[in-house]
Curated annotation (Swiss-Prot):
SMART domains tied to this protein: cNMP (SM00100), DEP (SM00049), RasGEF (SM00147), RasGEFN (SM00229)
DEP domain location: 110-186
Tissue specificity of this protein: Widely expressed with highest levels in adult kidney, heart, thyroid and brain, and fetal kidney.
Organism: Homo sapiens
Name of the protein described by the UniProt record: Rap guanine nucleotide exchange factor 3
Interaction with PDE3B: annotated segments: 218-242, 398-422
Keyword flag S-adenosyl-L-methionine: no
Molecular function GO labels: cAMP binding; guanyl-nucleotide exchange factor activity; protein domain specific binding
Organism placement in taxonomy: Eukaryota, Metazoa, Chordata, Craniata, Vertebrata
Mutation effect (residue 321 to K): Reduces activation of RAP1A
Principal subcellular localisation of the protein: membrane
Length: 923
């Protein structure tokens, strides 16, 4: 590679050959002295990623070369360009806040002329200021999407942090009090009110509202631990839930940490936090920024980033620091736990922990719940408030049965324990083991006590088993049809219950009430099937009578089409079980004429990349990516495969057809289709998907995979249509429609498709179309900027999470982030801890999976005029969503054709092809 500005001498840059005589001995860490400042090579050397293990050869024309020893692939930020760029970003952010503060000041003067005036307090006069409480009242009176005092306090804290608001005594924390006075710096602005100014004010308040929660969290962390309020402790605790350094800790420990964490900022890169050999006094978590880890002899070992931690080992082992920590960039923020607090928390955890042993081995570990950590109800008299941390599967089940009472409600902690167990039991207790254990408990009778006591014990125990089984059936529903062990167990249990009149009558009385009080959704998102009580209970619904809304759900026993291509692009379609293995697919192919043995099954994407499939791989038809196809070929032909023409995507766009349908109606059609896919996902599919098929072989995640494929399809659909629109004017109109489409999807609470469309608009092939973006009206560009805020990934997508928390169901969440959270929980926590099941991990996975149940707890109202609404209306009209297909948004394209179009989108997913088309549009 040759490097140089036009007119400069060219430098040839490449890996050095160690045995080359032209190089001589490499000079480790040396830089060539002959490289002038300002040349392109000088800039390359500043920004170039240089691994320690390689030397680089720099050949200047007619001059002797030199060698450079690299440090690591991560670029260091001590170059002037990087510092200038970072400072410019911070300066731009500050300018936006200052401008927002001036706009807010101007509007407050116009609406509340007496807000800012001279104040007298404790014999002191404060000129031209307002009290904290009055300022909060004034901003609340503006409306503009601000609904709570805490939200306004966050806005004011942002203004205070950036200097757009000042405390008369220079306090750094905003307080909503009458005796705290604040003033806006600078001259008093002219009170001008225009329609455009009101729009800018709304945009300013939205910006401040977005940054408000982060400012409040920083204030809470800056406070001394003893001065933090309960609300601030909850805020810190919520933040700790998304920090990977503490993901392995229990929630009770995280609450303890929230009370002792200290905020420690450092402003300058190169600051040494501590040195190797120092005494360990603190444990650090990186909240913002990054650090370099350096040791004697090895130099730079690694770089740690946001969410990583360091320093814990020295506290645990009471040993000196094993490395030196150096700030890698400016403005690094750390969360610090001092040694005495660290040791106290460890001791408190041990004091709250109870271990049960059998035959000299620990079989159950319980932790006493902290006061206020549980639901807001008084503890039940005589019942200890312990949480299962780990245990053997049998002991966890035994404790669950003992904890279940006949009078527990849906808000009882036992109900959550039951839900956690049922959602995750396949991870640690397969159905065969669970059924055997339940039958064992059903037959167990106590050895001592009177006959009446024994009879009461047996009756209560069997009631608990029936209740657990009924909830198990309610959760999994028809998924148990394909499990022979489960069906056999349910039949045996039905026979046993039929012999006991008390249990049969109790089952008939309790089941309808249980169904009304506690609805555990099945795979279709509707009410769970109830048992039909005749002479014997029928546990499972009749397969001949499918449940409402289940037509699109793929079950384990279903057969799906396997479209298999030959190298000549001829296609054979087989109907095979969705969980069929590659070996079974090849066996079915062997029975077809013209197919020979010795061939392999591979999947090929639109770029022509082929990946061989292992014989034991299952569900390959439903796990195919976007525009991927299955090919059966001889092994030597794999590298010669050419994608099927259908994989390459369209060559002509649909801009003319899309012009006939409004963005509102298009969003409604997309949302209706997404709901049909989203409702087909069972909660447990998230857990199965994260664990992988190698752990659970007799389950399918086809519904979840189909929904994820739809997400990818939508984002590439946006990029495809824009790249296939050759005329600048219509292309700008199409871009405008997609931005409005994203806004309507957000309004309809379809956040998954909203993110997909926004990701499509941010595709590099689209974002580079500068002339197209310039054609957009200013109002549309402002709308796009406002929508982009929800995509902010900082602090683990805090903006999105806060927005989601404010939405009431029905909601379609951003599924990739939910799966990321599930993967984070799975990979950050061991399933086994000291040979016991880590039930704390199961609890966290179940909590994440229940997000689907929460989002679908109210039925959506169809938004498309094509689909019937009568059968979908919810009983509670207050939660029904209003149709967006108003008279003002009627489209000239028929709803039927639009519905067919959104279900069969054709896209180009080859990024190289999209980039090529983009360059043709705007070179």
């Amino acid at each position: 590679m040759k490097v140089g500005w036009p007119g400069e001498s060219c430098w040839q840059v490449g890996l050095a050959v160690e045995d080359s005589p032209a190089l001589g001995a490499p000079r480790v860490g040396a830089l060539p002295d002959v490289v002038p400042e300002g040349t392109l090579l000088n800039m390359v050397l500043r920004r170039m990623h240089r691994p320690r293990s390689c030397s680089y050869q720099l050949l200047l024309e007619h001059q002797r070369p030199s060698c450079i020893q690299g440090l690591r692939w991560t670029p260091l930020t001590n170059s002037e360009e990087s510092l200038d760029f970072s400072e410019s970003l911070e300066q731009a952010s500050t300018e936006r806040v200052l401008r927002a503060g001036r706009q807010l000041h101007r509007h407050l003067l116009a609406t509340c002329p007496n807000l800012i005036r001279d104040r007298k307090y404790h014999l002191r006069l404060y000129r031209q200021c307002c009290s904290g409480r009055e300022l909060v009242d004034g901003i609340l009176a503006l409306g503009l999407g601000v609904h709570s005092r805490s939200q306004v306090v966050g806005i004011c804290q942002v203004l205070l942090d950036e200097g757009a608001l000042c405390h008369v005594k220079h306090d750094w924390a905003f307080q909503d009090r009458d005796a705290q006075f604040y003033r806006f710096p600078g001259p008093e602005p002219e009170p001008v009110r225009t329609h455009e100014m009101e729009e800018e004010l709304a945009e300013a308040v939205a910006l401040l509202s977005q940054r408000g929660p982060d400012a409040l969290l920083t204030v809470a962390l800056r406070k001394p631990p003893g001065q933090r309020t309960d609300e601030e402790l909850d805020l810190i605790f919520e933040e700790l839930l998304h920090i990977k350094a503490v993901a392995h800790l229990s929630n009770s420990v995280k609450r303890e940490l929230a009370a002792v964490l200290l905020f420690e900022p450092h402003s300058k890169a190169g600051t040494v936090l501590f040195s190797q050999g120092d005494k360990g006094t603190s444990w650090y978590i990186i909240w913002k920024g990054s650090v370099n880890v350096v040791t004697h002899g090895k130099g730079l070992v690694t770089t740690l980033h946001e969410g990583d931690d360091f320093g814990q080992l020295a506290l645990v082992n009471d040993a000196p620091r094993a490395a030196t920590i150096i700030l890698r960039e400016d403005n690094c923020h750390f969360l610090r736990v001092d040694k005495q607090d660290f040791n106290r928390i460890i001791k408190d955890v041990e004091a709250k922990t109870m271990r049960l042993e059998e035959h000299g081995k620990v079989v159950l570990v319980l932790e006493r719940a902290s006061q206020g950590a549980g639901p807001s109800r008084p503890p039940t008299p005589g019942r200890n408030r312990y949480t299962v941390m780990s245990g053997t599967p049998e002991k966890i089940l035994e404790l669950l049965l003992e904890a279940m009472g006949p009078d527990s409600s849906a808000h009882d902690p036992t109900e959550t324990f039951l839900s956690d167990f049922l959602l995750t039991h396949r991870v640690f207790m397969p159905s065969a083991q669970l059924c055997a254990a339940l039958l064992h408990h059903f037959h167990v009778e106590p050895a001592g006590g009177s006959e009446q006591e024994r009879s009461t014990y047996v009756c209560n125990k069997r009631q608990q088993i029936l209740r657990l089984v009924s909830q198990w059936v309610a959760l999994y529903g028809s998924m148990l049809h394909t499990d022979p062990v489960a069906t056999s167990f349910l039949q045996k249990l039905s026979d046993l219950v039929g012999r006991d009149t008390r249990l049969s009558n109790l089952l008939r009385e309790q089941w309808p009430e249980r169904r009304r009080c506690h609805r555990l959704e099945n795979g279709c998102g509707n009410a769970s099937p109830q048992m039909k009580a005749r002479n014997l209970p029928v546990w499972l619904p009749n397969q001949d009578e499918p449940l409402p809304g289940s037509s699109c759900a793929i079950q384990v026993g279903d057969k799906v089409p396997y479209d298999i291509c030959r190298p000549d692009h001829s296609v054979l379609t087989l109907q095979l079980p969705v969980t069929a293995s590659v070996r079974e697919v090849m066996a079915a192919l062997a029975q077809e004429d013209g197919w020979t043995k010795g061939q392999v099954l591979v999947k090929v994407n639109s770029a022509g990349d082929a990946i061989g499939l292992q014989p034991d791989a299952r569900g390959v038809a439903t796990s195919l990516g976007l525009n991927e196809r299955l090919f059966v070929v001889n092994p030597q032909e794999v590298h010669e495969l050419i994608p099927h023409p259908d994989q390459l995507g369209p060559t002509v766009g649909s801009a003319e057809g899309l012009d006939l349908v409004s963005a509102k109606d298009l969003a409604g059609q997309l949302t209706d289709h997404d709901w049909s896919l989203f409702n087909s996902i069972h909660q447990v599919e998230l857990i199965h998907y994260v664990l992988g098929p190698q752990h659970l072989r007799d389950v399918t995640t086809a519904n979840l995979e189909r929904f994820m494929r739809r997400f990818n399809e939508l984002q590439y659909w946006v990029a495809t249509e824009l790249c296939l629109c050759p005329v600048p004017g219509p292309r700008a109109q199409l871009l405008r429609k997609f931005i409005k489409l994203a806004a309507h999807l957000k309004e309809q609470k379809n956040l998954n498709s909203f993110f997909a469309v926004m990701f499509g608009l941010s595709n590099s092939a689209i974002s580079r179309l500068a002339h197209t973006w310039e054609r957009l009206p200013h109002k549309v560009r402002k709308l796009y900027s406002a929508l982009e805020r929800l995509l902010d990934p900082s602090w683990n997508h805090r903006v999105y999470r806060l927005a989601l928390a404010k939405l009431s169901p029905p909601v379609i969440p951003f599924m990739p982030l939910l799966l990321k959270d599930m993967t984070f929980i799975h990979e950050g926590n061991h399933t086994l801890v000291e040979n016991l099941i880590n039930f704390e991990k199961m609890r966290m996975m179940a909590r994440a999976a229940r997000m689907l149940h929460h989002c679908r707890s109210h039925n959506p109202v169809p938004l498309s005029p094509l689909r019937s609404r009568v059968s979908h209306l919810h009983e509670d009209s207050q939660v029904a969503r209003i149709s967006t297909c108003s008279e003002q948004s009627l489209s000239t394209r028929s709803p039927a054709s639009t519905w067919a179009y959104v279900q069969q989108l054709k896209v180009i997913d080859n990024q190289r092809e999209l980039s090529r088309l983009s360059r043709e549009l705007e070179p």
